[in-house]
Amino acid sequence: MKKQLCLTIAVVACLVSVVTGLARSSADEFYKGKTVRFVVGLAPGGGYDLSARTVGRHMGKHIPGNPTIVVENMTGAGSLIAANYTYNSGKPDGLFIGIWNSALVLRQALGDKAMRFDARKFGWIGAPTKGTPSCSIMAHSGLKSLKDVLAADREIKMGSTGPGSTYDDTPRILNQTIGTKFKVVSGYEGTGPILVAMRRQEIDGGCWGWESARTTARNLLDASGNEKLIPFLIHRREPDPEVKDLPLIPEVIKGEDNLSA
């Protein structure tokens, strides 16, 4: 449970060395008039997509030659399709950047044959933010707190993009550690579709980075009635100022939280 996922930007191997090895004048000449592709492995409207578009809006101004930045979405398998594409089809020419769930690297280390890449050969260049896993539930579920979730006498449907994502891993781990009854519903292409499914009452909630949730789900967090999204758990060792009363996963697992939230 110490794992904290982060939105990771990976580029085809040797991009970092090519860029850093260029003199200013050479870089100006190389990038002038060029287009840099950001390929995002999840759907529009989610945290990965918004982070990529925010970075892309400004990054071109800080690269010699001021290239144009174009953001594309390549969804599927919790961003695995984009990761495999980055490694096998993206050209190592300094003009291609893949943005996908860094937890896929762990799946490669565990021997998952679906990972058609070698993470050691990517050029890792940064992460806009580190994610703090959190879990939220819709008011239409009739649940309002972790105490309610643990006492539920039915399965609670949690949306997921696929194995290896915070959406998928966190509820499964909580089932094994604190006895929740989450049913993981996989196959959504990103946070946007998951939020739509919540509003349609196809699912009850989801677990994903609080940094993303507080932005992408702001309208639901601020809503009232059955449309309201209620955070009930967060993976931090210290409370987050915005949701300071939420139970902390490490304390809950160790039995140090009275679940009064």
Indicate residue ranges for each PLM-predicted region.
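Hinge/capping helix and adjacent helix->loop/strand transition within the periplasmic-binding protein
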Residues: S25, K61-I63, Y85-F96, L104-D204, ...
